[in-house]
């Protein structure tokens, strides 16, 4: 018997959408409510039941990493609650019934892998009378395996959470409801069939087109802590699946979720014939932290400071600031009524904690006649910011003389004066230095093997000729990798774009010890708020050349602007020092903005010419959480068409920047960054400059910390 179809007019849709209009909130008691069922992940990742999403969201900052197995498919997903009203999910799908390719020499017997991205937006937050209402787009930037759009609602009633939604595309193939948008335009009545082989392109022309179906379900939180049950009625008929037409004996799916600590374990029965299971790990990037073993800030009550500046034990002051305040001094001036300390905070990434600890040391070891402490922090021997501490106000704070005193009330941040810049004479401005750190390069979804990695040591060495000029180098030593599985270098086809990045495999599969970078750099302050640098040498793994940059960055401003220009040549992957014939001029005008309407975010827009001489814009969006973790995404849009670009359609990627002190028991500065670029082609590629002024001037208007 054919499934019943239901008419769904535009007027009905309009009445449903009216629930999302703020003016309907007429009763003051109609406030957001809480619900007893904790949202859990669906099979493909993202908050939902089993195969269908719900309108629910995780708490802001929540991150869920999931693995699920459902016979024909395996899913590995990461879901992130960027804002209270926005969820984003990235997913890899392993299609067990399909090969990656039919060329055994290229991908062997590896099964087909696919990448997908989902987003969901909350339109209305649940209140006493009204449900959560959300709209979402699944697999909107991939090859379309699970491409679909949906609108749904969720309402909690005691231990139950009810969900009802409308789906298009993969969520609507049951076609049991008439698509109301057909009344607007005939093109909405049909949805293009098949899957996109190129991927990476947003098929917005497919949105809300074609068949439409109802889906929904219920969750029940049992009296047993951590155990909940989920039942759903789904809208897919499984006849257009990438794994092939799958048998569906029932539209009902059932299962249970058991939560233990930060883990969710799930077991489900789907389609009336398939058993699946999964596990999710959750953490919150706002609240994640690490216990610290550290001495408390110095108590100054009862301590008698020196009578005058001449009585200050400078060597003890140097040592105490470094050992107990994390502040390394490079120059020092003590006058009758003020003291200036040029240096760098190397331990406490929390600004207030650093000021608190340093201020207590200064208050105990400097005479009371000194009324101001100036902490002039420098970057690459260029003074960047002057933290001016009012000594009397700070003493009142540190001795608890003022109730509910806040350290922020004791200091202000200003730009260093020209007099301070001219007076700066750093100790040990010249000399050699050496450091070593681990590197870990990884890539997912490759034809040779799903996961490829390279682990090793990056040894940095340099020599400073003076406070402005230095030579720097990096040597990579590979300790462990499986990059030898790479079997593709350059195909025989004539490429539309120069091979500026697609030859990367030739660069990473060379000798165990390689020369990564060697370059000279000059950097200085041009004027108040203006900074510049020039550099030349082997600038990155694949390119060398010369370049320069200038940046405008006011103190504690939401806005910064910079321009860089570079002439580069491509390095020869078969030689340590030689270059190839290809050369290019590349550079950008970049604007950085931290909007007040999106707290803890930064947007960068860079307009210019890329390595392959294509022109356009690169946009980067970053979100910082309370723990200091930063999550970002970027994309390049150029005058190269998606067909000319190739697989992926355009350059895009994601990254996570994690503070070092989340992993260790001691306070520390420094970060590790983990990038993910789904497809790296030649269009929209920027030069990986070894030093960028946005990083050098970070303390001028901190975003990362």
What role is predicted for each listed range?
Residues 26-145, 157-158, 170, 202, ...:
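Transmembrane beta-barrel domains of Gram-negative outer membranes and organellar outer membranes
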